[in-house]
């Protein structure tokens, strides 16, 4: 029994997964494969902001250098709070709970099935945060989108304010 790792690059505007790599290691080169897929799809003159946690792969010279070659602005979480990387956490949660199996016979089987899952996610799964559109459709659009989601910080503050005094 071995582990498989999934590196994902998600477009924050459309929620479309634009790069991924299923691998048996956590090496920088494995993360770079997903990043190269995403950068290859980037339209010319598009401004890219790359946001990630502070994983060693994303802080490496090779990964950061590739982002810099493509004139990407780099953003990273400050303190490891999952809410600072909410889109990535949400995509991971959707894939794990709705689409991806827990066990595969081998890495090749995992890669094939996960590629299918990502296709379903990108082209069939509707998102409330996208006003019930699918990521592939939103990815072709421009301009503001109607967003529907719960704001953790706002609702937490409201709860705090509405509590009776003790």
Regions flagged by a language model, labelled:
Residues 1-8, 12-120:
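RNase H-like DDE/DDD metal-dependent nuclease/strand-transfer catalytic core used by mobile genetic elements
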Residues 68-72, 94-166:
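C-terminal domain-tail junction helix/linker
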């Amino acid at each position: 029994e071995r582990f498989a790792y999934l590196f994902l690059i998600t477009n924050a505007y459309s929620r479309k997964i634009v790069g991924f790599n299923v691998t048996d290691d956590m090496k920088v080169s494995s993360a770079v494969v997903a990043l190269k897929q995403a950068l290859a799809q980037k339209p010319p003159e598009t401004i890219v902001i790359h946001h990630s946690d502070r994983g060693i792969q994303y802080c490496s010279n090779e990964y950061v250098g590739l982002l810099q070659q493509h004139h990407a602005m780099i953003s990273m979480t400050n303190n490891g709070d999952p809410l600072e990387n909410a889109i990535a956490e949400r995509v991971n949660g959707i894939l794990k709970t709705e689409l991806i199996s827990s066990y595969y016979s081998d890495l090749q089987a995992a890669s094939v099935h996960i590629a299918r899952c990502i296709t379903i996610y990108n082209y069939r799964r509707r998102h409330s945060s996208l006003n019930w559109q699918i990521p592939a459709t939103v990815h072709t659009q421009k301009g503001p989108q109607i967003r529907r989601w719960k704001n953790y910080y706002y609702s937490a503050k409201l709860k705090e304010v509405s509590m009776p005094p003790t």
